[in-house]
Structure formats: C-alpha cells, structure tokens
C-alpha cells in the first residue's frame, strides 16, 4: 500500500495540522462531510501574528473535528534554534546577510511533535497544507515517517476531488459560509507569510517578481527600517554566553530560553535587525525568493560569531563554517535528525560552542547596520601584546621571523616552477596589465 493516499480515507481517523486559517478550516469541514473522522492538531510555535491560540482547537471542534489538541512546541523550537546557531547551520546568504533557516527549524519541530501527538491518539493518517511544489511537503513527509513508520499521508491539496470542489480561496470562503460558519475571508495580501517565534518568511505572489523589493513587505517582528518616517534611535546591547548558551541580555539573566529569545526579538525588532532578501534553491532545485525576519537570532548570532573568532583558531573556524554550511543544507532539506546532521551538529556543539563564554556589547542602528563596541571572554586567544610594535616582552624575536621566512623559500620556489610550466604549455599568457609575474625559463625565454 502506498504511503501517500490520493483520495480521502472515509471512515478513518485523519489528523490535520490545523492553523485555524481558511485553507485548513475548509479542508477539515470538507473531510467531515465526506465521511472521514478528522482530528485537528495545532502547534503553538509562538507565532508573532497569532494572539489567541486557545481559540483555535475550539474552532476545529466547531468545524467538525472529532478531537482537537494544542501542542506547545515553543521550548523545543528555541532549543533547536539555539542548536542551529551554535553550529552555524545557515547556508543561504547574500553579501554577508544571513537567512537563519527559521522555517526549516519550525518544520522539524512541528513535523515530529504533531505526529507524536497523533500517534498517542491512534491517528495514523496525517494531512497538512503544504503544496506539491514547495519544500514543506518533503520536510513533513520525512519527519512524520521518522516518528511513525506506519504513517500514511493524505493531503487535500493533492486530492483532485477536493481541488475540483474547493480549488481556490473564494470557493473555500463560499463553502464555509454555506455551511453556516459565516467565515469572512481575510483581505488578500501581496504576499504570503509564515512565522514562528524564531522568525518570519514572506514569499509568493508579488514577491515572486524580482522587480518587487523588500519595501512592499509589512514586517511583523520589527520595524520597516527603510522608511524615512520610522524613527530609530541607536541602542547599545550586551549579550552574554556561557558554554555556548545565551544566558543574559543587557545584564538581565534568563532562566527560560524562550523568554530570552522573546526579549532578543523585541530588542532586534526595534531596529529591523535580521531582515534579508534571498534567492535560494528549493529542495527540487528550482529557485525561489523570500524576504525573511529573525531579529532575535540575528542579535545572538552577531555576539556568538564575535566570540567564535576571538576564541578559536583559524582551522577550527574554517571547519565550523564548512560544516555549518553543509548542516544548513541538511536542515533546509528536512534532514535535521538524520545521522549525518546529528554528527555535524554535535561536533560543533561539543568542540566549538562549549568554549563560547563571554560578553559582547553591540550598538544597533537601522536594519543590519551595527557596530561591535566591546568583546570580553576568559577564553580569548586574542592577545594583542603578541603583535605589539612597542618594546614589550615578545614570544618571538626578529631572528625567529628571519628563520621562518627563510623556510618559505621552499614553497616559493615550487610555486615559481609550477607557474613556469603553466606558461610553457600556454595556460598562463598574462598581458601587460596582468598582475601575474612574467615567468621566464632558465634561458630567458
């Protein structure tokens, strides 16, 4: 039997990831009318644009759910977000501005915790609102089957009968109104938004055009820093880490990581910190474009990276960055709990993050404009006296450096010989304006 069901399994329990929005509301009621036994599961991910989580399961029952549960995913979401930060699991950047993989982290948490809750209720069929062209359909597929190997997947948006009857938002709104729910369709935005406590994603519709910029977006986690009428005062912020964990902001210690990240969001959001415009490759290798927000993670990342560069040596930092980029791709692909991802993540958490103890003071201005004002750590290997040009006790002398430079003659000679070979076979033909050396053979040719 196929894992993916193309038609509604009537008479059986079907779990649906229920947001309370028009799409999942219409799908739930439609499944009920068609003979399935729908169960609704809502993840509390601390979405900044959701103000009443408790009302969502009640609406699901009203629309026909046989059962509805609200699953608090915030603690796990923040734990996975900090793990991603510790391992630098961010592979999408443009000119040094980073996307913090906030949606992939949210999917890892939602996909595992909701399916675990369904399994407790004896629900082994799962549906959600992801479309066949996106990343989430594969992410949820992988995470769901990891938790429940007996899981079957039913997605109304892959069921042709559902599509024929309720193929668009107007049809869904009319369907709900005719059912007596007086469902008022929200005003259409120029883009779609998905969010959690870690960050927000804005994409699709008008944002599919690269002629539309960030200015059409109304931020939900911070301010529109590009607007002249938005006044933003410079602000100094201190961030403290202990053994890789963020523990304090502006001298205030937080026992609860969720509360710390909420405060980091408020601080960064006042400046529009962490917003980025990215073109990326989806899992299926088609390119897409998104506008992202992550004010809190961006603030923590600035401080964390500063301490990484001050504490670890060059080879460790290089390995951390290479592994982080690879891990970021695995996270994006829905492989956050795969063995290769766990290996990369735990390596960074053990050998990089564990040494990260210290405090960084940052001045935030507008958007991603900031300055680092001070860096303190008992683990710093940055020792300016080693390189001071003043008369100080030194770890090495001028004579030591002469010897070190003399040893470089070996590889310089090898490099010169190799360039000569390349020149002789026509691989190097520098013009007059080239910075490449004019390599000649022993005969002067």
Swiss-Prot record:
Q: Which reaction does it catalyse?
A: L-citrulline + L-aspartate + ATP = 2-(N(omega)-L-arginino)succinate + AMP + diphosphate + H(+)
Binding of L-citrulline occurs at 99, 135, 139, 192, 201, 203, 280
Is ATP-binding among the key words of this record? yes
Q: Where does ATP bind?
A: 17-25, 43, 129, 131, 136, 194
EC primary class: ligase
The processes (GO biological process) annotated in the record are: argininosuccinate metabolic process; L-arginine biosynthetic process; urea cycle
Lineage, top-rank taxon, reads Bacteria
Task: Keywords in alphabetical order, please.
Answer: Amino-acid biosynthesis, Arginine biosynthesis, ATP-binding, Cytoplasm, Ligase, Nucleotide-binding
Matching SUPFAM superfamilies, A to Z? Adenine nucleotide alpha hydrolases-like, Argininosuccinate synthetase, C-terminal domain
The main location class comes to cytoplasm
Residues engaged in binding L-aspartate: 131, 135-136
Pathway involvement of the protein, from the record:
Amino-acid biosynthesis; L-arginine biosynthesis; L-arginine from L-ornithine and carbamoyl phosphate: step 2/3
Localization annotation:
Cytoplasm
E.C. number:
6.3.4.5
Q: Which GO terms describe its molecular function?
A: argininosuccinate synthase activity; ATP binding; protein homodimerization activity
* The keyword Flavoprotein appears for this protein: no
Any one GO CC term of this protein is: cytoplasm
| Assembly notes | Homotetramer.
UniProt xrefs under PANTHER family: ARGININOSUCCINATE SYNTHASE
- Family per similarity comment: Belongs to the argininosuccinate synthase family. Type 2 subfamily.
Which HAMAP family does this one have? Arg_succ_synth_type2
The protein in question is named Argininosuccinate synthase
């Amino acid at each position: 039997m196929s894992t993916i069901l193309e038609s509604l399994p009537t008479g059986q329990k079907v779990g649906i990831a229920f947001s309370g929005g028009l799409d999942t509301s219409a799908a739930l009621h439609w499944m009920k009318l068609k003979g399935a036994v729908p169960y609704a599961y809502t993840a509390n991910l601390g979405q900044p644009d959701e103000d009443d989580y408790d009302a969502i399961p009640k609406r699901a029952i009203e629309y026909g759910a046989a059962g509805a549960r609200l699953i608090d995913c915030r603690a796990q979401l923040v734990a996975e977000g900090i793990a991603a930060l510790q391992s630098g699991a961010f592979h999408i950047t443009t000119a040094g501005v980073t996307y913090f993989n906030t949606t992939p982290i949210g999917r890892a948490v939602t996909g595992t915790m909701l399916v675990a809750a369904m399994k407790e209720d004896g629900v082994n069929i799962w549906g959600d609102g992801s479309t066949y062209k996106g990343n989430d359909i594969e992410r949820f597929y992988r995470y769901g089957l990891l938790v429940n190997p007996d899981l079957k997947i039913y997605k109304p948006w892959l069921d042709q009968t559902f599509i024929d009857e309720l193929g668009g938002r107007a049809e869904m709104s009319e369907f709900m109104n005719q059912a007596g729910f007086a469902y008022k369709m929200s005003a259409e935005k120029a883009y779609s938004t998905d969010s959690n406590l870690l960050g927000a994603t804005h994409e699709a519709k008008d944002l599919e055009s690269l002629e539309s910029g960030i200015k059409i977006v109304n931020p939900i986690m911070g301010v529109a820093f590009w607007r002249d009428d938005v006044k933003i005062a410079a602000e100094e912020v201190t961030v403290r880490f202990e053994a890789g964990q963020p523990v304090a902001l502006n001298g205030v210690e937080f026992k609860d990581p969720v509360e710390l990240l909420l405060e980091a969001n408020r601080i960064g959001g006042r400046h529009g910190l962490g917003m980025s415009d990215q073109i990326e490759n989806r899992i299926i290798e088609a390119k897409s474009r998104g506008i992202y927000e992550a004010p809190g993670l961006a603030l923590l990342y600035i401080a964390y990276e500063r301490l990484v560069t001050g504490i670890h040596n060059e080879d460790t930092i290089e390995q951390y960055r290479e592994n982080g980029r690879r891990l970021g791709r695995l996270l994006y692909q829905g492989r956050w709990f795969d063995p290769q991802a766990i290996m990369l993540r735990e390596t960074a958490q053990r050998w990089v993050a564990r040494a990260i103890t210290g405090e960084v003071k940052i001045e935030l201005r507008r958007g991603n404009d900031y300055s680092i004002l001070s860096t303190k750590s008992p683990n710093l290997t940055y020792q300016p006296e080693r390189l001071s040009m003043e008369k100080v006790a030194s770890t090495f002398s001028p004579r030591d450096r002469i010897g070190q430079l003399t040893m470089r003659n070996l590889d310089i000679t090898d490099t010169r010989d190799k360039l000569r070979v390349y020149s002789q076979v026509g691989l190097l033909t520098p013009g007059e304006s080239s910075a490449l050396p004019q390599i000649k053979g022993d005969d002067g040719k």
